């Protein structure tokens, strides 16, 4: 992992690295700067740091739980506006970084329903 981290940072001293433990809560390597967690089933509690003192991060799919657009239609939203807003408020308030995955079709179009949901939540 050390060699991979060094290669990822080559040419940009400000790059930060994480190794994804998928749905797990463990850290692959001491050379990573933040914890890269995936929400697969539930909304776990999140604090600013994990047990190793590393910056917390959670990745969440807004629509397609399989991450990759596979059909002709976009997947429905997984969460109501209230659920997603509550999740973002709680986790970001605790200092946890959050990445939202939005389904993209083969033409490059983002799921319009997900974009509309983000616009509604932003207004709150």
Regions found by a protein language model. Name each.
Residues 1-124:
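Mature catalytic domains of secreted/periplasmic carbohydrate-active enzymes
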